[in-house]
Amino acid sequence: MSLNFSRFQYISNIFFILIISFPGGLIYLLIGSTLSFWLRESGFDKITIGLFSLVNFIHIFKFLWGPLLEKVSFAPLSKRGYKYCLIIALVSCIFCVYVLTNFNPNTHFIPFALCLVAVAFFSSIYDMLLQSSQMLLITNKNWGISEAACTTGFRIGILIAGSGALYLSTIISWQDVYRAMAILCIPSLLLIIIYPLKFKDKIIINDFDRFWHAFYDFVKKPKWLIIVSFMLLYRLQDNFLSVMPNMFYLDIGYTKKDLALGYKAFGMCATILGGFIGGFLCRKYEYSYLLKRVLIYHALSSLSFLFLYFYNRDITSLYIAVFFQEFTKGLTMSPFFSYQLRCCSAKYCITQIALITSIAYISTILFGSISGYAATYLGWTYFFIVAGFCFIPAYILIRYLPPYVISS
């Protein structure tokens, strides 16, 4: 009986993680790629749309309030404190998204932008709590399953906020689309409220000094500056492109319905497939070899943009181009995430993961914000040519990474 109950508790915890991961992916895209379509239809130029990437700057600093969040959520109230923080973070996200829909980005630019920053802030808190839920609810040997559940829920949220929102926008206004997306978060909120949390271990409260110990431990690593530089530059191509592919597809004549199915839905499937294959290749090849190869493959995907621009703009060509772009993007993701874990010490893994993901996010914000300028002043042809060469800095740095990072 006890064994059956434990198994039931394990399965229900996995299901809980899957469901609460859904709002994370949904909100992530609402203030990212999907937002660019709304801004485009509101008359904003590519430069301004690119600058809206700066609303996510708040994610860079999430490692600073991580220890504070642990103190507030875990120390006084234990399970209830953790649940209350989850509820407050998600309710705040839903509320801010709803408030956002009451502002027109053209006539109420500053309130609109401030609402986006608020959504980004509360979503960063929700993401941290979501990541910790796996460690609190699931035993170590089952983290692989819980990560798969978390990724699945997150990707479903991205799919709904991408393909679903884009398709809905052809029927109703963008304000109503965002209201509908906010409503879709409510089932996850209700589950958080009613679900009985059972932590597998007693919660250990980290001291604030732990962050500084974790930081010092990281900077003691051999060639840590090269490790950080590689982390900043590895996804330079994707960060430089940012949301500009959305603008490109619209400029060359594709409709939002075309993009909802071909770019968002089909592209998401291609990314997931590439991620699984990339994960398998991590077990087969040394990192130094694999990282170089996937960087080159993904760099070549820029040619698909030029193919569409100069030669063929039918639906079949869109699907082929999107598959090439998103599949190779997926290939690059698994080795990179594994690389991030290899950079962490086991005893400081949570704090250091928060730290290095914040570092990686700097590249997303910095290069994403200038993508609009680059696309405007270079034109689409040279913009995608430059994007294709963005792999070179990271490719060069691979040979200088310490062996414990890139050796199998």
Curated annotation (Swiss-Prot):
Gene3D superfamilies in UniProt: MFS general substrate transporter like domains (1.20.1250.20)
Keywords for the protein's UniProt record, in alphabetical order: Cell inner membrane, Cell membrane, Membrane, Transmembrane, Transmembrane helix, Transport
A GO term for molecular function: transmembrane transporter activity
GO cellular component: plasma membrane
Highest taxon, organism lineage: Bacteria
Membrane topology of this protein: Multi-pass membrane protein
Alphabetized InterPro entries for the sequence: AmpG_permease/AT-1 (IPR004752), MFS (IPR011701), MFS_trans_sf (IPR036259)
Signal peptide per UniProt: none
Spans through the membrane: 11-31, 49-69, 84-104, 109-129, 154-174, 177-197, 224-244, 261-281, 294-311, 353-373, 378-398
Cell compartment(s), UniProt: Cell inner membrane
Record-stated family: Belongs to the major facilitator superfamily.
Protein name: Putative transporter AmpG 2
